[in-house]
Amino acid sequence: MPPRGNEGLDFTPIITHYLFLFTSILAFIAWFTAFIGQIIATARWNGPVGTLWFAIFLHLFLILGVLYTLASDSLATHRFQISVFGAVALVFAVNGANAGLYAEDGALNAMAAGYLILAIVDILWLLFFTAEEESLLFHLFNRLGTGGLTPPSRRRRARSVHNMAPANGYASGGYGAGGGISSHDVATGAYDAKPVSGAFDARSGTASGAFDNKSAGAGAGLNSPGGGARSQHSLGGPTTATGSVHSPRGEDGTGSPLMAQGDMSGAGTSGEFLPKAKALYAYTASPDDPNEISFAKGEILEVTDKSGKWWSARKADGTNGIAPSNYLQLL
């Protein structure tokens, strides 16, 4: 689901996710019961509730905070705060249940029943908001429905990609398909940044971006006297129809980013075995991240990079992209 941000609230995740639908209804009923019980008990006994007045309003703001987090699809942003205040609220809920559960007053009994239900809801919410995506609990909760919520790790990764893109030119054409390297890209250190969409595949030795001879040459000589002539000479090799730069073999080594595509293919993985992974669950790529790939449950993928929580993989039809590692199992 695309991040909603300031585009408004959508309560569909609460309605379609059975866990949140059930716990939200329970939380409101329990809070109202405990609140009315506290009011009556305070009016009758003038003060047996004490600090539970703080607890009842803490639970109110916790419930509203959970609903806002789900409706705004901001798990990655608010899960830590919700977990902290949820743990504090759980302690107060247990104290509230203990304060009136065995009392001989109906109002205190109602208050205790409300806090007991709130404690159960607090535990379920804590288990969800503190569960990592690789954990069994996260998968069990997702079996009740994802609600279209963005997983926390994908949300963080998507933000880092979007924040990085304008700075180094990768997402705007620096290394994108058919994009050329401008002098701005070279001057700002575009070579040192991590590509967004994997324009250069180190395993297959192919490059999807085209290099602009003039702009790359101009940028390469910004920091050295006479650099313009030198860079034009180093980039003076013939250019193919696809825009790849063929530099003289004697000047650019195998580690040069200006290496010819034909030379790159020699460093490929001819005959190299790529590990395969089986999809444990069906996955639909996020529409706001073009790097992700969708796959069906049981589909076999070739894994080209196993580092991190998001693996680079290739489908049987040749589609390349990234996939969440917790959805895959190596064969």
Curated annotation (Swiss-Prot):
Membrane topology annotation: Multi-pass membrane protein
Gene3D superfamilies from the UniProt entry: SH3 Domains
Function (record text): Plasma membrane osmosensor that activates the high osmolarity glycerol (HOG) MAPK signaling pathway in response to high osmolarity.
Ranges per topology, Cytoplasmic: 1-19, 68-81, 131-331
The protein's assembly and partners: Forms homooligomers.
CDD domains for this protein: SH3_Sho1p
Native source organism of the sequence: Schizophyllum commune (strain H4-8 / FGSC 9210)
SUPFAM superfamilies, alphabetized: SH3-domain
Bias-annotated ranges (Polar residues): 231-245
Name of the protein in question: High osmolarity signaling protein SHO1
Taxonomic placement: Eukaryota, Fungi, Dikarya, Basidiomycota, Agaricomycotina
